[in-house]
Amino acid sequence: MTQDEASAFCEWLSAMTGHYYRLPTEAEWEYACRAHRESEYHFDKTESIDVFAWHRFTSNGSAHMVKGKKPNRWKLYDMLGNVAEWTIDDYATRGYDDHNTKNPKILLEADAPAVIRGGSWKKHPSALRCGAREAMDPRWEEYDQPQERERHSESVGFRVVRPYLMPVTEQERVSFWSHRSPEQ
């Protein structure tokens, strides 16, 4: 699953339902993952990550069906582990340190890698934290033929958001599903 394929699904879902859906920004993803907690994890220190996340030591080497582990406090499943998740943002090394922190969406140059969040079943449990972030592997976007499985990642997926504010102008509608602005 590439970021472009995930965005295309959001656009298709929007057309089918008449409601707008898109990939979350990094900030939206982290807010949903933390579920009003300030700690590294969305669960108490007395609980084991094993009951919340599929990771290197619990996954048996593959992703699993959603809801196989406990959800966070907002009943969102698999926010950590199982598959990492696409966001609409570009990867900035310092995250939001150099960018707007109110309703942020980080867009850099056209060839900037996108951000994935949440970690996957391949990761060590210590890497599965609410604030952990990674840049995508460029090979995931460079496939020529769909059968080239090594060009896709079996450990990256996506979840959708249905934002409260809908796109109004034509420019907003054009850029709604893409991590690129129409000028790029």
Regions found by a protein language model. Name each.
Residues 26-27, 42-44:
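Short, surface-exposed recognition loops or helix-turn segments adjacent to catalytic cores
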Residues 1-37, 57-77:
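Short aromatic-cysteine micro-motif
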Residues 45-50:
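Short, surface-exposed glycine/acidic/tryptophan-bearing loops
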Residues 37-38, 62, 83-184:
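Surface-exposed recognition segments
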Residues 34, 43, 54:
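Phosphate-coordinating loops and pocket residues in cytosolic domains that bind phosphorylated ligands
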Residues 22, 40, 51-54, 65-68, ...:
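Conserved beta-strand positions that form and line the central face of beta-propeller blades
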